[in-house]
Amino acid sequence: MSYAIRVAVVGASGYAGGEILRLLLGHPAYADDRLTIGTLTAAASSGDTLGEHHPHLTPLAHRVLESTELTVLAGHDVVFLGLPHGHSAALAERLGPETLIIDCGADFRLTDAGAWGRFYESPYAGSWPYGLPELPGGRERLQKARRIAVPGCYPTAILLALLPAMAEGLIEPAVTVFAVSGISGAGRAAKTKLLGSEVIGSARAYNIGGTHRHTAEIIQGLRVVTDRAVTVSFTPVLIPTSRGILAACTARTSSSLSKLRTAYEKAYQVEPFVYLMPEGQLPFTGAVIGSNAAHIAVAVDEAAETFIAISAIDNLVKGTAGAAVQSMNLALGWPEAEGLSVVGVAP
């Protein structure tokens, strides 16, 4: 009998933790006993059953959430961290180097300490391999890794929309992004501005003018494929839906649509989760909900000499939990797409 990988989820009562568990329950490795779901932890929710927070996870609904302590995490092969920013580093440094730790927070995403200091209050903890396999060189860095930083949801949508054009030098490096996100992207903590009466029938811009924390991460990703000085003007907007990100990315260009589409076809033809829409079709969030897919469309406004890329992802799947499971598969040497669907649940 082969050895079963034992998995723990820290922050299991949150949206990211719950979505990781949903994907693990549907993973072939769980079905054929290559993977078992071990300890589930939470902070304020410790002592509750998982079903009190995620009633849809019926096979695990009876499980009791434990306090996040090193003693209950010992002996696990894989630990997913779904903690608030600034809380992962202290826990991660106490887990052994042989443990595969996959952090869904921001603690280890940025490679530049200065960039971290501009956006986060906690001390810089360093960087880990970045869990975006579609980034050039990213897949190789994740294979056999034991520490992985899951990308932010906005950077995932935006980088997938821009990387091929930026890599081929087909657009100017000054990028403007307008992106809308479902409310789950803001987490599960109780906040007045996230109450139903505040968000239903309303859209709200936030952290504009270069103040959103994901801006540094987007620039970092684009600099992987270009030596030019990249700037990103990013405007995020919360919309009254649970899931989904739709990002509209623009930049000046003198390239033809044909040349741009060729670059995207070349970059994504072998990617299992990135789908370049047929010319004339546009992504929408409903088509990717529940899936690990990213739908991309590109266009050129010739009169304005402007390139437009539109991307749609599920912020909780490709934007968080799906990327975490995709990274786990690569790190463990399993098929990358195992347990992950490209089929959404629209309408």
From Swiss-Prot:
It is found in: Cytoplasm. Its EC number is 1.2.1.38. Pathway: Amino-acid biosynthesis; L-arginine biosynthesis; N(2)-acetyl-L-ornithine from L-glutamate: step 3/4. It is an enzyme of class 1 (oxidoreductase). It comes from the Bacteria. One of its GO terms (biological process) is L-arginine biosynthetic process. The keyword Cell division does not apply. SUPFAM superfamilies: Glyceraldehyde-3-phosphate dehydrogenase-like, C-terminal domain, NAD(P)-binding Rossmann-fold domains. Coiled coil: none annotated. InterPro entries: AGPR_AS (IPR023013), AGPR_type-1 (IPR000706), NAD(P)-bd_dom_sf (IPR036291), NAGSA_dehydrogenase (IPR050085), Semialdehyde_DH_NAD-bd (IPR000534). It catalyses: N-acetyl-L-glutamate 5-semialdehyde + phosphate + NADP(+) = N-acetyl-L-glutamyl 5-phosphate + NADPH + H(+). One of its GO terms (cellular component) is cytoplasm. Keywords: Amino-acid biosynthesis, Arginine biosynthesis, Cytoplasm, NADP, Oxidoreductase. The active site is at C153. The keyword NADP applies. GO terms for molecular function: N-acetyl-gamma-glutamyl-phosphate reductase activity; NAD binding; NADP+ binding. PROSITE patterns: ARGC. Catalyzes the NADPH-dependent reduction of N-acetyl-5-glutamyl phosphate to yield N-acetyl-L-glutamate 5-semialdehyde. NCBIfam families: argC. PANTHER family: N-ACETYL-GAMMA-GLUTAMYL-PHOSPHATE REDUCTASE, CHLOROPLASTIC-RELATED, N-ACETYL-GAMMA-GLUTAMYL-PHOSPHATE REDUCTASE, CHLOROPLASTIC-RELATED-RELATED. Belongs to the NAGSA dehydrogenase family. Type 1 subfamily. This is N-acetyl-gamma-glutamyl-phosphate reductase. It comes from Mycobacterium leprae (strain TN). The gene is argC.
